[in-house]
Amino acid sequence: MTCQKFYVVLLHWEFLYVITALNLAYPTSPWRFKLFCAPPSTTDDSFLSPAGVPNNTSSLKGASEALVEAKFNSTGIYVSELSKTIFHCCFGNEQGQNCSALTGNTEGKTLASVVKPLVFRQLGVNWDIECWMKGDLTLFICHMEPLLKNPFKNYDSKVHLLYDLPEVIDDLPLPPLKDSFQTVQCNCSVRECECHVPVPRAKVNYALLMYLEITSAGVSFQSPLMSLQPMLVVKPDPPLGLRMEVTDDGNLKISWDSQTKAPFPLQYQVKYLENSTIVREAAEIVSDTSLLVDSVLPGSSYEVQVRSKRLDGSGVWSDWSLPQLFTTQDVMYFPPKILTSVGSNASFCCIYKNENQTISSKQIVWWMNLAEKIPETQYNTVSDHISKVTFSNLKATRPRGKFTYDAVYCCNEQACHHRYAELYVIDVNINISCETDGYLTKMTCRWSPSTIQSLVGSTVQLRYHRRSLYCPDNPSIRPTSELKNCVLQTDGFYECVFQPIFLLSGYTMWIRINHSLGSLDSPPTCVLPDSVVKPLPPSNVKAEITINTGLLKVSWEKPVFPENNLQFQIRYGLNGKEIQWKTHEVFDAKSKSASLPVSDLCAVYVVQVRCRRLDGLGYWSNWSSPAYTLVMDVKVPMRGPEFWRIMDGDITKKERNVTLLWKPLMKNDSLCSVRRYVVKHRTAHNGTWSQDVGNQTNLTFLWAESAHTVTVLAINSIGASLVNFNLTFSWPMSKVNAVQSLSAYPLSSSCVILSWTLSPNDYSLLYLVIEWKNLNDDDGMKWLRIPSNVNKYYIHDNFIPIEKYQFSLYPVFMEGVGKPKIINGFTKDDIAKQQNDAGLYVIVPIIISSCVLLLGTLLISHQRMKKLFWDDVPNPKNCSWAQGLNFQKPETFEHLFTKHAESVIFGPLLLEPEPVSEEISVDTAWKNKDEMVPAAMVSLLLTTPDSTRGSICISDQCNSANFSGAQSTQGTCEDECQSQPSVKYATLVSNVKTVETDEEQGAIHSSVSQCIARKHSPLRQSFSSNSWEIEAQAFFLLSDHPPNVISPQLSFSGLDELLELEGNFPEENHGEKSVYYLGVSSGNKRENDMLLTDEAGVLCPFPAHCLFSDIRILQESCSHFVENNLNLGTSGKNFVPYMPQFQSCSTHSHKIIENKMCDLTV
């Protein structure tokens, strides 16, 4: 065993010596090759690839064991015959062609391995080796697979790789020593081995020397020495980010991410499988990171893989990426989403597939948000199955809740699919405003993103490029631009600062909106920093009121920058909480001050100044710090104070003490302060002298001469007042009575009105002075100076009504003060009123308000009580049944409310109260034997008479043939002829229970039917003997109703009340009652009138020549009721019916009453 190991080591050294001496580093295909070992006598290729066996790697792997066994049998070498066998090992391709070059050299120039034939057969000698450099250029990998099945199954095998990375291999003076090689142990499994060689990134371009050493069952195999460059055998990583989408043109775009780690360009191979109506498989090589597949149809599926390799062809193909699946929808939009700006155009294309059938493009319609159909003028046909819609001059998308886009639907003529395309229209007209500071060192630009906030997922940035000098006429976006960092402020604006700046360089800038759908740019704008300067505010601002002139003078100093001519703006106002500003413009660039007129010279003014370029470019500066004026005397007082006097002492004496009183001057009069007051005296004997009283407002002096004139002067730091008031005290003038009367009337507790009359005099009246004081209080006297041309004056003070006041009126002349008019208290009437009721002004309004409230409450209560209790109570004076009754007698009420033994028939309530006009003639008896007939009562309710209009009833047309003995009278009737229809009716009530004879019935029937039969009316058949009963008949007359129309609502529903009353009234053995309706209108419409019978409401024409002119009714005991209530024999009697008209008639005595009913509308 020791000898065997020694022999293997010897072979190692021999191998290294041979390849070093002869420089036999094997230049084979470095990424994939084979290792072959064969006996020396076997030099033909049949050993490596015998006839009948395919020359490929897979065949060699599957049949290597059989090949080796067959080869040994053919050579006749047996284990018993040979104890040692020498093999030649070499590299070759799959056909082993390179091994033949080395088989002839057997004198120490080849690697010989001495093994037993049995071991040779079991281990196998053919290896498939592949080496590559990893894509990250950090690791060199060799992968080995034996061609025999399970070569290391029965032996403990080890594989090592020895390598060296010399910088220069050709100039080595000596062969490389074995110690210079580094060894790595390979990881082996049953079927494969893999060796990892770490290569520094700096040595990827060096030549790598290596060989393999395989040890198994005590036998070692060594491969020839290999030389290769790792950079040329790089195997990239598989591409990542494989994705697919339908392009705007309807093609399928396959794209992936580029490998940023690769230091060299790559080429890609794409293979895809299309499964649609036709299955298609293809593999294409491209240099870009995307591939377009055309003719994409809806409902198709694609399976795609991609791998990469160096573009120059060297290296190894990477592994295939993971397969990616993609399926197109039944309705395809391309593009599915569009992001565009306002005013631009956009187009969508669509392919619609419905139930495995592609819809023709001519059958496709487009909708916007499923609410608005897009006009067909915007449609275009791209192909038989592709429809296109175009939108022009788009407007900004208005967000609707969570939807920030417009949904565009491609629909079939019959239905729409739920899929849609998205249209985002953004207003990119963003205003960028820039401002250069006053020091001209930086420029700040601001802009608002409010118009693009609806675009979710977008980012905005400001991009710009600078021109060396000035701005171009038409700014444009350049592909090469710079990004400016902007910060969002609290006010919602972005702010970007350019520093340093070039004042005369043009900065073209725009806002770029980045989104996953694309990017949009706002219109570019060019800014010249020198044109947007905001200067520093003026400094050293001062303000003062000038002396004597009284003007507000403002001065300032111009800022250092910019050097351009500037204009200035001054604002000023009275100092206070809310300043009312006034402005003044100064356009003189050289001016540093301005004088302004002001109204109040004695007030404090606050002043500020700002500036900007005179040519209008740039911005106004900030306002300067405020400057305030000081209050000081600017002029002499405008006038002296007004003053009055108080006289003390006995008026009979020639000497009296006079106290002068005056009010301090206001600032506007003193301009602006008073240091002291001076009183000047003038008398005839003593001349003129002055008294300085300082700041006091009173002075007492002795009046001893007949005339004494005084003047009060106000003096400030400038001088004494120029205009002053004089007051002359004169004994003769004090007796001049110029005031004739004086009255005082209190208006309220704070106002009293004084009125007076003056008597004519020869003196010149200057003014009047009013004095008043409270006689019960020691507050002192108050006074007012008023003009001389008024005769009443309102005094505003705190007056107590129960106090007593004294009012005095002094006339003041140029010669002196006249005699006053003095009254103690108010006018007498007012005094008594105030004394009786001091709180009159408070009590009276309270009393008036209480009375109004009480009156309103009573009126409301009265109306409610009347509505609840007295609304339905009739007035006896307006009721027909109360006519002629004396309600002063007790028996009237007893008879009125006595219960009758038998029931009577009630008529219906009238629809409205109306006066009655009637014309009735009564005969005392019948001339034939039929006098004894049942009695009846008639109550005629007709229209209200109108004295202005009348009508004559011609009785000849209405005489009855059956009553020849009756003599008719001729009378007049009156009609109101109203425009609206009204209801009139007459009710016949009788308590007779017996049935009249046929003859009696015929008499009445004939009198009625005669008028109806004049024109052969069809109503004649309706009036049979059975249908006409004398017991109770009712005729309803409708006047002034439109021709040929009878209101069914009035005819039926209105009379249902009558029928209800008759039907519900308890009466034994009472026969059926009949109700008949008569239509009455004007004479010129009579031929069109209608009659409504009691049979099924049939409408029949009414006779034009007669209106039931003769109706005879028997009556006896109720004649007094007719006479009293109807005033027989009279005409024009009016009454207002309120209750149903009825009366019960006895059967003991009867009278014949002939009632002439005339047409009231003739």
UniProtKB/Swiss-Prot annotation:
It is found in: Cell membrane; Basolateral cell membrane. Pfam families: fn3, Lep_receptor_Ig, ObR_Ig. Glycans are attached at residues 55-56, 73, 98, 187, 275, 345, 356, 431, 514, 622, 657, 668, 686, 695, 698, 726. Disulfide bonds join 37-90, 89-99, 131-142, 186-195, 188-193, 350-410, 411-416, 434-445, 471-526, 486-496. Residues 891-896 are annotated as: Required for JAK2 activation. Belongs to the type I cytokine receptor family. Type 2 subfamily. Receptor for hormone LEP/leptin. On ligand binding, mediates LEP central and peripheral effects through the activation of different signaling pathways such as JAK2/STAT3 and MAPK cascade/FOS. In the hypothalamus, LEP acts as an appetite-regulating factor that induces a decrease in food intake and an increase in energy consumption by inducing anorexinogenic factors and suppressing orexigenic neuropeptides, also regulates bone mass and secretion of hypothalamo-pituitary-adrenal hormones. This is Leptin receptor. The lineage of its organism: Eukaryota, Metazoa, Chordata, Craniata, Vertebrata. The gene is Lepr.
